[in-house]
Each structure stands twice: as structure tokens, then as C-alpha cells.
Amino acid sequence: MTAIDVMWVGLGGGIGSLLRWWIGLSIGKVYKGNFPLGTFLINISGAFVIGYLSILFSVDWRDRYGDLMNTAVLTGILGGYTTFSSMQLDAAKLATARGRAIAAGYLIISVLVGLAAAAFGAWLAY
């Protein structure tokens, strides 16, 4: 790890966090339900893009760009974009407001759909 790697991860993380914030606000303006749709869609779309790009970066792009794309995009941007901690907070809020079964369902659905999205993205990249 070099100083330039730290810079790329930090820059990418800032971009990803801003994207997450903006998309979350945009979804919140349209969707008024109790389900944490913004966090769910952000995490699922991020899982899809990570699955897709991880295949491209490992197969085609590493020779051209080295580890820059992996560092800046996968770890930085998509690491800042997706949000495990917000998913956990949303589940905790659901558990106190509506019951543990709904919170558990949200977590299970998030993980299963996220895995499917990442696998689908990887499959498309092949």
C-alpha cells in the first residue's frame, strides 16, 4: 500500500458516499413507505456493479490500468457507496418499531438479493 493508494481509496470513498447520500435523498423524496428502500436499492445496485466490475478488472483491465481501477473504484467508490452499517441501523429501527420478524426478513432479503445481484453482475461480465 502506497500513499497514492490511500489517496485513490479516500477520493473514491468520498465520491461513493456522496452518491449514496444523493441517491438515498432522491429515493426518500419519492418513496414514503416504512421499508428502507433507499439503503436496500443502494446495496443491491452496488453488489451488482461490484460483481460486474470485479470480473472486468481481474480479466481485462488489470494489464492496462494495474491496481488503480480496483483500488479507486471497487474499494473506494463502491466501498463508500454501499453501506453495511446503514443496513444494520435500518434493521434495528425496524425491530423496535415493527418487530423482529420484519427486521430479520429485511436482513435476509438484503443479503440474498445482494448475493444474487453480485453473481448476476459477474455472470454478465463473462
From Swiss-Prot:
It is found in: Cell inner membrane. One of its GO terms (molecular function) is fluoride channel activity. Keywords: Cell inner membrane, Cell membrane, Ion channel, Ion transport, Membrane, Metal-binding, Sodium, Transmembrane, Transmembrane helix, Transport. Pfam families: CRCB. GO terms for cellular component: plasma membrane. It catalyses: fluoride(in) = fluoride(out). The chain crosses the membrane at residues 7-27, 37-57, 68-87, 101-121. Signal peptide: none annotated. It comes from the Bacteria. It is a multi-pass membrane protein. The keyword Transport applies. Na(+) is not transported, but it plays an essential structural role and its presence is essential for fluoride channel function. Belongs to the fluoride channel Fluc/FEX (TC 1.A.43) family. This is Fluoride-specific ion channel FluC 3. The lineage of its organism: Bacteria, Pseudomonadati, Pseudomonadota, Gammaproteobacteria, Enterobacterales.
